[in-house]
Amino acid sequence: MTNSLRRCLAAVMALCCTAGAGAQQRPLVVELFTSEGCSSCPPAEAAIGQLSARADVVALAWHVDYWDDLGWRDRFELPQSVKRQNIYVRNLHRASVYTPQLVIDGRFDAVGADGSAMAKALAAQRTSVPLRLSVHEAELLVDIGAQPQSPGCDVLLVPYLRHATSAIGRGENAGRTLEEFNIVREVRTLGSWKGEPKAFRVSVASLPRDATDVAVLIQPSGQGPMVGAAIQPLR
């Protein structure tokens, strides 16, 4: 794991440890772009596993497909992962996609991260949109409260698999068994939100069969800084 990624994770941990007293603080969203074919990714995956145990973090691992040429096809790869990463690369003024890339709250990534400056900025910007998730009679209920003067946002539903192990047969990780956490299985846009009270209903049966949990992200259109996030176990 690179020094910049270590600094980024240290800043996240420090911020989470100091944010607990704020009852209205929403969870911090930590997104990892990763691949089973990348030998630098397992330590970052382990960090996602640690973060996923925290109630004050929404940790998601997006598996990309551009490592396939090295001989191993990631069974969890999604075209949407690459699309999402490319938007962040543009927004964060990076030259190209890479793994492992850690994006924090849609605002920072690990490249050149200044840990103390990042933690301070994140703490100052963590607005909280009223967001409640529940499951009732095989339906996922998403209820968003009012938040005046909010930017136009997308409401994203992200089903994920909490934990998996994969035996890798080829590529950079050949011969290893990898532990993977909070693996994104799909992303769909439920609708838009502009600060008004809003509700969505989703049939649990319509979600990927291997999804164990869902995250809902409220994010300005174009993948701007997060304004809301919550998770809900499906079983």
Model-derived features: positions:
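Cleavable N-terminal signal peptides
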Residues: A10-A11, A21
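G-domain G4 guanine-recognition motif of GTPases
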Residues: H63, G106-R107
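Short, conserved sequence motifs used for protein processing/export or organelle targeting and
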Residues: R75-T99, R107-R235
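Active-site-proximal cofactor/substrate-binding loop regions of enzyme domains
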Residues: G22-L92, S96
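Ligand-binding face of N-terminal immunoglobulin V-set domains in extracellular IgSF glycoproteins
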Residues: L102
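Bacterial N-terminal signal peptides that target proteins for export
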Residues: M1-A10
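N-terminal signal peptide c-region/cleavage motif recognized by signal peptidases
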Residues: C16-G20
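Secreted/extracellular small peptides and ectodomain modules produced from precursors
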Residues: R6, A14-L15, E36-S39
